[in-house]
Amino acid sequence: MGKKVQLVIWIIIAIVAILLIGVVGYNLVLNQTEEVVHPEVTFELENYGNVKIELYPEYAPNTVTNFIKLVEKGYYNNKVVYGKDDICMYVGRDQEGNAINPTLGLIDDSIEAGTDADYEYTISGEFVANGYQKNTLRHEKGVISLIRNDYTQYVQTLTEESYNSGNAQLGIMMSDNSSTLNGVYTAFGRVTEGMEVLEKIYNEVAIKEPETAEDGSTTTSESDIQAFSAYPVIKSATVDTHGIDYGMPKTEKAFDYSSYLYNLMSSYYSDTNQ
């Protein structure tokens, strides 16, 4: 009787082992054959060529969704490459150097333009310093990152407002020496074609970013405007989502830094005059 029980137990163990091997083998085959499809955006840079960008929703899903929606709505058409520094090239201002913040009415057809609901919006920064742990994409050459404001250089307490101030302007990494951006800016894509186009612009075109005032506005002289008119223009921006609907991004009303400063100064002078 004991031998029969042992035999049954061994048979059960053998069956379970075979099933486990089958499941593990199936998962290995599935992982090897299942291709991850990423959305792709193409910028047609007038007189220069095309740049293709692969997007990574697994790292920054809301940033990717917002970028896709802006491309679909034509936001980047006729915008320019407007600035560069030692590690990065900047994209997304108009041909007079103005940063045109998108409004909800642009991306949401249910919102009527010019109404109270059609306000300028921003999105939450998807990076470690902002409490988001899933974005491990590093700022390396060719990586695309979302530009945001840094109000803390003027008011140190405005960290949260700074982290969540990005919406549309982009930084394209032109160097691997950009590790200082890791964890404090949202990287969400990478150039897969046309890097030579960007390098030509970066190395040969004299691009001067307009100066930014303390309230976040830009000051451009007539000569600056003339210079901007000669900067590389995005003739068109298109997106291929491979049939996937990424929906609408989660947004928040843009922080009004100018009003904040005005109220801060008014409160200060009111207190000093009492």
Where are these regions (language model features)?
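Cyclophilin-like peptidyl-prolyl cis-trans isomerases
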Residues: 1-274
